[in-house]
């Protein structure tokens, strides 16, 4: 005879299991806490500014995020700050850097400079990192003080 469990019963059972399971208890002596912070799709939003509307906004930007990162680091000594990619392209500032100013060797991209300042521990490359071409990408990430992690992109020497 088949056993049928309603969605509500399943969710209630799962919630009960999680609440009673030992991993939900506070850490015991000898255990460590790790706090993970992650950003994604920054799209060159270093400043709290909407370049399309030409006005300051308070919903985007690493400048705004910096205060949150500082708060978390004050709470936790074991905190990692990671980025999930798509940080070099996505707004007029990114286009200006890529098409007008360029990324000469030795120059530091504003997003990379901000990420270095905030102490990012690692980042991956998103699909938009490749939009401006490999020379721009390689020059942009060359100044990163953190590793760029990728399992499916290979740089030929």
Where are these regions (language model features)?
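Acidic, metal/ion-coordinating pockets
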Residues: 2-5, 9-12, 17, 22-157
């Amino acid at each position: 005879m088949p056993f049928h469990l309603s969605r509500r019963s399943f969710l209630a059972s799962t919630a009960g299991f999680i609440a009673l399971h030992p991993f939900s208890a506070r850490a015991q002596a000898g255990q460590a806490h790790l706090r993970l912070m992650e950003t994604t799709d920054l799209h060159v939003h270093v400043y709290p500014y909407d370049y399309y509307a030409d006005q300051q906004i308070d919903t985007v930007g690493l400048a705004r995020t910096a205060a949150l990162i500082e708060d978390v680091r004050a709470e936790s000594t074991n905190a990692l700050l990671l980025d999930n990619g798509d940080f070099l392209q996505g707004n007029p500032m990114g286009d200006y850097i890529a098409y007008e100013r360029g990324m000469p060797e030795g120059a530091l991209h504003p997003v990379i400079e901000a990420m270095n300042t905030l102490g990012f521990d690692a980042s991956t490359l998103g699909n938009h990192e490749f939009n401006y071409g490999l020379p721009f990408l390689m020059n942009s990430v060359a100044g990163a003080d953190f590793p760029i992690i990728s399992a499916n992109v290979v740089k030929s020497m």
